[in-house]
């Protein structure tokens, strides 16, 4: 008997595995530090705006997220007509793949890049080409060496998840200059709000001056609206026009749009999160290094720690040890980092408990 056959590439996809949900010993307080969520939650203004939509849930959203696009435009100094909003930046990444990739095409991602990139690539029948990183950081020369006539997209998370590393804007510009004009460079800036380095740029300048570069961003991280799934893209008019032709007309709900508008206007809430993150990023790096772990320098709201391969000291054993204590970190075997754990920077209490827990774990005979 015949049965439906998925399109080429679909069955080659390894399903995405999100961060673990909290499970601990009975009676223990649980801290989820596996999904890079903010410990401060959304702005109170965003919560109030979200609730204000409750009396009109029978109404469809405005189809282009116009008010939200205008708010983003004001915040970043951008033309709203060159912005697309989506149900998380994941939707926009998939729309870009659907717009520009097909069978026999190729897209390039890096060794430890965001797992949605190969998923979006394979889902459209294209081939995912992996460029090696250097010191857990994107290597522009390695990416350029992988370019072929079949290359249609280069995916670049800057800064990158799960490594927390970034490349300076001069390197991003060098990458764009080295790519053929028909290749779309996708700059995923999900964690840009946490970066304070002088040589970093979110990508707006490059998008504004080329017709083959886009920048995506999200409200899930520093704005604390992950549950509402809101992302956006800034791109050249030609790409925005093409993507809008396949974007669903009501893809961002009214409550989500209202909450996002309020969130982007609350700069004090964002600054509080940014300050907390930077202080704890430095402290965690220092304390975990003292314990005997190797910590990859991070510019994000998480740290990547590397464990020995010695029995009793491994990442898997540390993960189990912490989980029993209600501290849920992210194992990274599916990112080709089996000897590492990623820790979201959480509340003061959660961060202190992780330090104490890992100190106890590493001190075991």
From Swiss-Prot:
CDD domains: AAT_like. Keywords: Amino-acid biosynthesis, Aminotransferase, Histidine biosynthesis, Pyridoxal phosphate, Transferase. GO terms for molecular function: histidinol-phosphate transaminase activity; pyridoxal phosphate binding. It catalyses: L-histidinol phosphate + 2-oxoglutarate = 3-(imidazol-4-yl)-2-oxopropyl phosphate + L-glutamate. It is an enzyme of class 2 (transferase). The modification N6-(pyridoxal phosphate)lysine is found at residue 221. Pathway: Amino-acid biosynthesis; L-histidine biosynthesis; L-histidine from 5-phospho-alpha-D-ribose 1-diphosphate: step 7/9. InterPro entries: Aminotransferase_I/II_large, HisP_aminotrans, HistidinolP_aminotransfase, PyrdxlP-dep_Trfase, PyrdxlP-dep_Trfase_major, PyrdxlP-dep_Trfase_small. Its EC number is 2.6.1.9. Residues 1-22 are annotated as: Disordered. Its cofactor is pyridoxal 5'-phosphate. GO terms for biological process: L-histidine biosynthetic process. Pfam families: Aminotran_1_2. Homodimer. Belongs to the class-II pyridoxal-phosphate-dependent aminotransferase family. Histidinol-phosphate aminotransferase subfamily. HAMAP family: HisC_aminotrans_2. This is Histidinol-phosphate aminotransferase. It comes from Rhodopseudomonas palustris (strain BisB5).
